[in-house]
Amino acid sequence: MPRFLTLPEVAEILNVNVPQVRALVRSGELKGVQIGGRGMWRVEDVQLEAYIERAYEETEKRINAGAEVEG
């Protein structure tokens, strides 16, 4: 995996759409950086892995609290 990923690449990895990735970056849940003259957004691979790890932790907390596991 390259060190910096485009938003479409992140969307493909997470199996979501690009607007959802933009929303994650905008909210600060997923750290991104603007690089280059056109200000293209990139997400560093370690930031994506950290986001995924936090998602696992939050999911575990919800399951332990009795949340249903669906689809």
Residue ranges and their predicted role:
Residues 1-20, 54:
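Polyanion-binding surface elements
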Residues 9, 26, 68-70:
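Compositionally biased non-globular segments, especially hydrophobic aliphatic-rich helices
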